[in-house]
């Protein structure tokens, strides 16, 4: 296995875990907060999608599909406190945008050489191109830990 294949496995596992946790949740359930002051899943999905777009554009400028008009404005730090479903995309729309973005990520990953993964990014939390691609799986899993709590609060059985 080479670096590219290892990074793709991490990205794919992050996708499997994350989407597994939300596949049977309704739009209303995506607004449930795991704790007071925590962000609901709908907002977190938008944040993750937007972050992936930004991160991959840092290491592969222009590689990512454009986000839909108004997407960034719906998923800001200020909007995180809102529980008004009309201010956010529906789950089906979010997942469609996610799949478009993830396809861009995987296409950009495929174009990298092993030497490219060692190139610096200038970003503290992901100092190399390889680290930035790795973030695309780990960032999602980090948030999915909260989603496991939401699922239990909503009466769902553990998935993993």
Task: Indicate residue ranges for each PLM-predicted region.
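A structural signal for long alpha-helical coiled-coils and helix-turn connectors
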Residues: 26, 110-113, 151
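Short, contiguous alpha-helical
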Residues: 8-12, 16-19, 29-77, 122-160
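Hydrophobic alpha-helical core bundles mediating ligand binding, dimerization, or RNAP-core interactions
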Residues: 11, 15-18, 22, 98, ...
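Basic/polar N-terminal segments that are highly enriched at the extreme N-terminus
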Residues: 1-5
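Acidic-glycine-rich active-site phosphate/pyrophosphate-binding loop
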Residues: 19-23, 116-120
